[in-house]
Amino acid sequence: MATTEATLYEIKHGAAWITLNRPENRNALSSVLVTELYDHLMAANADDSVRSIVITGNGPAFCAGADLKSPPGQLSEGSDRAVPYADVLTTIIDSPKPVIAAINGAAFAGGLGLVGASDIVVTREDVQFSF
């Protein structure tokens, strides 16, 4: 399992699992998280052993949307770029592999973008969606 500051990446039984890993702030979309998510999506698409991609969240929420406390364009350690959120959505939409959003909790604002871009959405009955 590859672990970074804001995401987890693991391949299980032919599926690449990408977990948003900022439960302390409901997996809000910081520049670091967005860049790592993009990198994991690209890796999964390039890996012939991966047949599907699953995106989920760690903790009580799937994704709370934009991280309003994170400086725009903040880079992760060792990174020289920040990826625009729109590039993540385009990568999900254009993925040659099915992308499954496994919604474990509330999905708000930008988190709904991930839901809408995915091919399949699986959720619990008590999940909340909101703009």
What name fits each language-model region?
Residues M1-N58, G73, T90:
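Conserved CoA-thioester-binding segment of acyl-CoA-metabolizing enzymes
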Residues R26-N27, K69, A109, S130:
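Nucleotide phosphate-binding site architecture
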